[in-house]
Amino acid sequence: MSTPASLSLAAVIPCHNDAETLAPLIGALARLGPFAQVIVIDDASDPPLHARTLLKAAGKQARAMPPDWLRILRHATPLGAGAARNLGLSLVTAPHVIFLDADDMVLPDLADLARDLAHDPTARSFDFCIFQHHDTRGDQERLWGQRPFDDRLWRQAGLALGALGPVGPDQAALLVQTANYPWNKIYRTGFLRDKGIGCTPLMVHNDVELHWRSFLLADRIIASDRIGVVHVWRPKGNRLTNRHTAERLRLFPVLDALAEEIALSDRPDLSRAFNAFVWGLADWIGAHLPAEDRPALHAHAARFWLTRTPPEARQALRADRGALLDRLGIG
């Protein structure tokens, strides 16, 4: 029996000194089947990545792929995952794309989802499909799947169970509040290009823009309960997620521009969700930021409060999250 046809997918993967985890990921992508392209952006790894070495470590099926299946481009200096993803996207020729991290693991459900999307009438002409994932922070708790906050939002949206289904505006306003990850979505390449959607070229928080503008500008969103990717959480080491410096404050001009774009869209549901997201993120940044950088954070927070937080949102924040405002210096 022949295997049902699948979407043609490209995988774009930034990598900085992660060859040991990248090679197994490349091997898994070769085995899964729907990946027509794998584009790796070497973000100034030391030593540099080499296709032959990676394919040797990735296994027999990866080595049997066509010569142009794996493409590696290199940044001479580290520019971050956002710039790497943007470069990778510019080279995609497949009609659909997924952005993966070099230490992610992909599961058979991802290939099944690609086949679902190719054959289910409800999925025709989708702009992106958001799917579920497993976060390894749950391993110690013997929990499989997403973190409780994200899982609760999926349940509130009525989408926690069901292999494939369209996402309405009210449901989108809930799912947009999930963690701003790039690797839990399959995008239509033309959608990203037509709308000018990409990542922010920052070292940290570079996926916020991709996440929110995708939800804002998509005409057709699909959701799937399939768990397609394992997100490996590494609380120690030199990973960008573990860097808590003033560079995180560079996100605030991006947040300001996003708030303006969302406000002009006449989507009050997304505006409320985004405002709540910004204040939660600012509080998280403040909890990890060195004391000498907190006055700058408070200045950014005060500016966002005055210019981007409408009166009704201020009232709700004062009533429900007064302690948060105190921590951010909002009187």
Please identify what each model-predicted range represents.
Residues 7-10, 37, 209:
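Cell-envelope/extracellular polymer assembly enzymes that use nucleotide-activated donors
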Residues 97:
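Short aromatic/hydrophobic "clamp" motif used to bind/position activated sugar donors
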Residues 102-205, 209-224, 230-247:
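Donor-binding/catalytic cores of nucleotide-activated saccharide
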Residues 223, 227-331:
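C-terminal subregions of glycosyltransferases and related glycan-biosynthesis enzymes
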Residues 1-5, 31-35, 60-70, 83, ...:
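Membrane-interface aromatic/basic loop that binds lipid-linked glycans or pyrophosphate carriers
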Residues 26-74:
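Acidic donor-binding segment of Leloir-type glycosyltransferases
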Residues 75-92:
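Glycine-rich, basic loop-to-helix element that forms the pyrophosphate-binding segment
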Residues 9-21, 25, 32-33, 41:
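A conserved hydrophobic helix/loop-capping motif in glycosyltransferases and polysaccharide synthases
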